[in-house]
């Protein structure tokens, strides 16, 4: 597996070791996993059969896949496992944003620990959602996404971006921001996004109140 380049130098230095740990945690069918260099280019070497292709395609560091045959590398076509383009996650740029590859890695490892059977779709909650990087990453992978964010400006930025993004992509969607009321008075806001069969819901509020907000 050819490792994807990272714009973050600190993250790039740790990428090979993180890629090893991620594949071990998410792909039980892979073995002999180790980082290697070919002509000065970092790769991740492993042994697996075709049943692992979907998992490999979702790896945060996967740029391309090759099969080692008689000392040569033969390209292997990866399945299209993402529901939306990667620019859903990469377009927003702001100070303090978590590295996109690292966010995907954390989501993959988290989902890899879930033992409950499911139809492929999960419900992902980020109780400190910021501007929605984790939520967008979950949507890309075909999961419903839920978030809570204390900062009103971050909430507004996430809502504005999603509305603009899906409108410009000409994708049928709804994105509604409504007030949240208690005892007849507004105490926050709620964003409900529906797109391509998926749901994203985000509240303004305290992470400690997540259970009540979604209850």
Segments and roles (model prediction):
Residues 56:
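Short, charge-rich binding segments
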Residues 1-27, 40-41, 46-51, 59, ...:
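Class I S-adenosyl-L-methionine-dependent methyltransferase catalytic core
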Residues 27-33:
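Short amphipathic beta-strand starts and helix->beta connectors
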Residues 33-39:
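Short beta-strand
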């Amino acid at each position: 597996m050819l490792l994807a380049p990272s714009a973050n130098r600190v993250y790039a230095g740790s990428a090979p070791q993180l890629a090893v740990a991620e594949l071990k945690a998410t792909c039980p069918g892979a073995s002999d996993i180790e980082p290697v260099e070919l002509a000065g280019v970092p790769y991740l070497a492993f042994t697996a059969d075709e049943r692992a292709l979907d998992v490999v395609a979702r790896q945060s560091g996967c740029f391309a896949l090759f099969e080692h045959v008689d000392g040569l590398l033969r390209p292997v076509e990866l399945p299209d496992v993402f529901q939306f383009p990667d620019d859903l996650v990469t377009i927003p740029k702001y100070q303090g944003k978590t590295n996109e590859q690292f966010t995907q890695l954390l989501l993959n490892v988290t989902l890899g620990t879930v033992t409950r059977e499911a139809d492929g779709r999960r419900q992902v909650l980020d109780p400190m959602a910021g501007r929605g990087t984790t939520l967008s990453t979950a949507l890309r992978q075909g999961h419903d996404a839920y978030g809570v964010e204390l900062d009103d400006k971050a909430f507004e930025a996430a809502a504005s971006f999603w509305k603009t993004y899906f409108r410009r992509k000409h994708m049928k969607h709804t994105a509604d921001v409504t007030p949240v009321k208690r005892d007849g008075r507004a105490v926050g806001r709620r964003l409900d996004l529906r797109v391509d069969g998926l749901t994203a819901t985000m509240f303004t509020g305290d992470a400690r109140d997540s259970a009540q907000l979604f209850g």
